[in-house]
Amino acid sequence: GELESQIQDIDRKKLECSEKQEFEEAASLRDEAHTLRESLQAKRRAWEEEVRSEVVEVTEDDIAEVISSVTGVPMQRLAASEGERLLAMEGELRRAVVGQEVAVETVSKAIRRSRAGLQDPKQPIGSFFFLGATGVGKTYLAAKLAEFLFGDEEALITVDMSEYMEKFAVSRLIGAPPGYVGFDEGGQLTERVRRRPYSVILLDEMEKAHPDVFNILLQILDEGRLTDSTGRKVDFRNTVLIMTSNVGSREVGSGGVLGFQNSDEDAYQAQIEGKINDAMKKTFNPEFINRIDDTVVFKSLTRENITEIIEIVLDEFKKRLVDRDIALRITPGAKSMLAEKGFDQTYGARYLKRTVQKLLEDPLAEEILQGNFTDGSRIRVTKKGEALVFDEERDSVDLEEEKKPETAG
């Protein structure tokens, strides 16, 4: 520490004085170093006595945390009052996933069924087919489900099936055969599940996968395990298998379905689901669809949904600024403009995120780089014409919660 550094400096000066034959100065430095060494030893003895008298208690939670970090098994979650959490599952997921009540309810029921012991123990916790247009929350629901079940969004294993369109690529899921390149690396699916047996597996864009991929998935759905190229059996029984597809959504498009107006929402949605389900049955084999726990058609997002999603997107953006101690207060007028310009039924929430990036993040980044705002700034974002403007907010206002509604601008 600091005393040790001082002693080293004094010893160095003492040596220099000795070389210059300044013996009186050297003797004085020697005495000073001796005093500091005695002080250092006294502090060290006091610290050792304090450590010896203090008993460190290791609790069950500490042991559970260590086991979780080593094995990837979420011990803390398993030890919690699981029943209460599962009964409140819909409410927690709905706060994050907007406008997809049917999807959230379907997934929640299947998870509860499995955790209650009513599911076949040989099969995964749940298997789902998520269908619908782009940007409606299919991948996002999978990520939030991983966070809810296993306490971490990192428990989501994503496999892009566009990488497995060719027959020769299919073997990479379970590992290359002996003698082939990549044999020592293990399977891109099996190895990740072996290292993290409690996880949500997301197979994205299933319609692009080679037909041989479905033979592998049939074994997972039937037996809950796979044998990789090295002969190891990989357990899938503690995973949730989610497959996504945009099949049928392009045909439906954004122009409605013949015979129904968009205002007749229930009939319109039922007709869309029928079209997408028909397209799914033409694309995937019956023996595969028959083994899936449930198929969910995600609804297209409405303007009201976008208004709710903008709050989630902006909250995530504010969290990214916490490290720099920068706080934003975005006025209702600014939020309304972002929601209005970010609404596109064809592209869903992804278009909203691009709008926020273009109208909010890019201009704010330029302001920060120009030195107009620094760490610790309190920034108010308001609407001015067709753009957002930023100014320093010096008043003692609550930057996280807008207590009073403001007029646009």
Tell what function each PLM region has.
Residues G1-G409:
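AAA+ P-loop NTPase nucleotide-binding core of proteostasis motors
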